Amino acid sequence: MEANDQTQNIPAISFRSVRKSYKQDGQTYDVLQDVTGDIQQGAIVAVLGPSGSGKSTLLSMCNLMRTPDSGEVNIYGKEVREWNVNELRRTAALAFQSAPVLDGTVRDNLSLVQRLHQSQLYSPEKLASLAGLPPELLDRSARDLSGGQRQRLSLARTLSNPSSILLLDEITSALDPVSALEIEELIKRQHQEKKWTVMWVTHNMEQAKRIADTIWFMADGRLLEIAETDTFFSAPQHEAAKEFLKGGTR
């Protein structure tokens, strides 16, 4: 789905009183607590916060990798559980740090995803090039790739998707700084070209400064602060955000 006359003024992503908990060893752990916020169409939002703050869980709800216990997650104004799953995942594509690879070659992985998405936007060669995968890797077993190469493959698969929302979960965590910058530039170029909405979970504060126009700060399962990037880094409002910035909390 893309913006049209009916949807162009609707947030691309909205969360309304979202809660999620898990039970383990007889204990209940609140992962998300009453999260409410909107991401407008065309925005790049970086989601920051300490480990265990619920960032990845929140992101994964946008394409039904997980579901909330209560509350709503809406994509273009439609609750995610009302979507056809395949259509939803063609609209909101997820790339994450530990994405599994499929049996077969890198080319096979890319071609299969293209068939699933009914998309031939790019050839496997073009997708590999966009994601910074050397062409000689296309016919290598995907299971032989390094951690960083697997992250690039995950990104290439996401780029094959005719989506308008890009959900990124620590996609440069296994890359060296130069490679991470290359991926950032790729995302920014594609964002400008395709007018994507991007929700990017990262621990890297410098990366967030470079890529995002808006920061969402989370801690202990709560969305504590939403601010323009410059404002967040120069004048955070919440005490937990101040401590995070001061100590580089992870």
UniProtKB/Swiss-Prot annotation:
Pfam families, per the entry: ABC_tran
**The organism's lineage?**
Bacteria, Bacillati, Bacillota, Bacilli, Bacillales
For this protein, the record's CDD domains field holds: ABC_PstB_phosphate_transporter (cd03260)
Domain ABC transporter, residue spans: 13-245
The GO terms this record gives for MF are: ATP binding; ATP hydrolysis activity; phosphate transmembrane transporter activity
Known Gene3D superfamilies for this protein? P-loop containing nucleotide triphosphate hydrolases (3.40.50.300)
Q: Which GO cellular component terms, listed alphabetically, does the Swiss-Prot or TrEMBL entry include?
A: membrane
Give the source's domain of life in one word. Bacteria
Instruction: Provide the family line.
Output: Belongs to the ABC transporter superfamily.
Q: What is this protein called?
A: Putative ABC transporter ATP-binding protein YjkB
Q: Which residues bind ATP?
A: G49, P50, S51, G52, S53, G54, K55, S56
Q: Which keywords does this Swiss-Prot/TrEMBL entry list? A: ATP-binding, Nucleotide-binding, Transport
- Entry's SUPFAM superfamilies? P-loop containing nucleoside triphosphate hydrolases
Gene Ontology biological process = phosphate ion transmembrane transport
